[in-house]
A protein has these predicted regions:
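Cytoplasmic helix-loop-helix junction between adjacent transmembrane helices
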Residues: 114-155
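Helix-breaking motifs and short loop linkers at transmembrane-helix boundaries and internal kinks
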Residues: 51, 83, 104-110, 138, ...
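Extracytoplasmic gate region of multi-pass secondary transporters
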Residues: 39-40, 231-285, 344, 348, ...
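Helix-loop-helix hairpin linking two adjacent transmembrane segments in secondary transporters
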Residues: 149-199
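Symmetry-related core transmembrane helices of the 12-TM Major Facilitator Superfamily/SLC fold
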Residues: 175-192, 394-412
Length: 433
């Protein structure tokens, strides 16, 4: 057998093919967020054209998350029970087409509709990608790989914010949508031909008195209990929501904040804001690496670390928006860009650790529903509404409250982690060509 055909223990594919699939998943997630977040840097240009309020501008971001909330759960069931490869490829094609359509809209209503369609396409990608990564790599490396993969979120957001402001300032905001949509089509086609893992049967095992193991198909009640009976899992979902409220607020409004507070032109404010987001390229992988190292000594590290990261982020955010100004403020925000995303790998891995392998996409979908319903979909509008009533600086100054809530939820969940882990069944994964 050739060396490059050897599948290492704990891996689903060979090393080379694992890297190829991971690269596709990384690039797809990056363009997911480029297409999703580019609109934030286009706010001043769209506002100038159509005279929109901050609340209306915020709704252009929230619309994506409303669609995700509505559809991510049913689509994740398709991912778990049908095919990761086909659903991911189809979703990427839909969100890329919708982004391209944004370049041709003629009114706020039409733009809101196309932004909603982007959310339709993106609804099941994160659950699908998370399930693929959980299957491809050993459990011991799950946080680290999740950290690397989730680094595509700030990278895509930063590229979207930076490119949006630059393209709009030179060629108009419509061109920004059209240009960033094209790569997603190419990646969608490539993923249609990727390998997948065999769909996992929903089987429950029970040890009998004679030592034999009885296997039976899960009932609807068994499926429901697989989630609701685990406090650590439930608290992780809500901790995600509180953190995502803060990160979405910053992704949406930070460039506009620099523009309004410091009178910096958007073509300069956008790259300045994007650098804060780009530092999450350090935060997410670093958080995953540290979490997995800590987990060797502390089994519940995948929730302890997010809790501590949220506490530190709360302090930095308070200093940035309530104490510091100018250079001191920007330095604090750069540190925040690292710390605030370091929670993601551990929390994302926890949603996979604590559930039957046949429900991995569904588990992360529930995390997305909760975080988008209570966090991402609310944040742009809430911050925009407070900004309309007061000012943008006052609106962003409330963010530490949400970080303290997140810390409380994660640290409480850590208390139940070991017990909940002991109830999860191990199921070997097989390749589907």
């Amino acid at each position: 057998m050739k060396k490059n055909k050897v599948v290492k223990p704990g891996y689903l594919f060979t090393t080379g093919y694992t890297n190829y699939v991971f690269s596709l998943l990384f690039l797809l997630y990056m363009f997911d967020y480029i297409d999703r977040m580019i609109v934030g840097s286009l706010f001043p240009f769209i506002k100038a054209d159509w005279g929109l309020t901050d609340t209306q501008l915020g709704s252009l971001v929230s619309a994506v998350y409303w669609a995700i909330v509505a559809l991510t759960f049913p689509i994740s069931i398709l991912v778990d029970r049908w095919s990761r490869r086909r659903t991911i490829g189809a979703m990427a094609a839909v969100w890329s087409l919708a982004t391209f359509a944004c370049a041709f809209v003629g009114s706020f209503g039409q733009l809101l509709a196309t932004r909603t369609l982007i959310g339709v396409g993106e609804a099941g990608y994160a659950p699908g990608g998370t399930a693929m990564i959980s299957a491809m790599y050993p459990k011991e490396k799950r946080s680290w790989i999740m950290g690397l993969w989730n680094a595509s979120i700030p990278l895509g957001s930063a590229i979207g914010v930076a490119l949006g402001g630059i393209i709009a300032a030179n060629w108009g905001w419509r061109h920004a949508f059209g240009i960033v949509a094209i790569p997603g089509f190419i990646l969608a086609i490539l993923f249609f031909f990727a390998k997948d893992y065999r769909t996992v049967d929903l089987i429950k095992q029970k040890e009998l008195e004679d030592g034999k193991v009885e296997k039976k198909k899960m009932s609807a009640r068994d499926m429901f209990n697989e989630f609701i009976s685990k406090p650590a899992l439930m608290l992780t979902y809500f901790g995600f929501a509180a953190m995502v409220f803060v990160t979405t607020s910053l992704l949406t409004w930070l460039a506009t904040y620099f523009n309004r507070i410091y009178d910096i032109p958007m073509e300069k404010a956008s790259p300045k804001a994007s650098l804060v987001m780009l530092l999450a390229l350090v935060g997410a992988p670093l958080g995953g690496y540290l979490t997995d190292r800590w987990r060797k000594r502390q089994v519940n590290a995948r929730l302890l670390f997010p809790g501590l990261a949220a506490l530190v982020a709360a302090g930095i955010t308070f200093l940035a928006f309530s104490v510091f100004t100018g250079t001191e403020q920007y330095i604090a925000l750069l540190f925040l860009g690292i710390v605030i995303t370091s929670f993601i790998p551990g929390a994302a891995a926890a949603t996979q650790d604590l559930i039957h392998p046949g429900f991995r996409a569904t588990s992360y979908a529930l995390a997305i529903v909760v975080q988008n319903l209570l966090g991402a979909s609310m944040a742009p509008i809430v911050i925009g509404w407070i900004s309309d009533k007061t000012d943008l600086g006052t609106a962003l100054a409330i963010l530490p409250i949400f970080l303290l809530v997140a810390a409380t939820l994660f640290l409480t969940g850590a208390m139940f982690y070991k017990r909940d882990m002991s109830t999860v069944e191990e199921v070997p994964m097989e390749v589907r060509h």
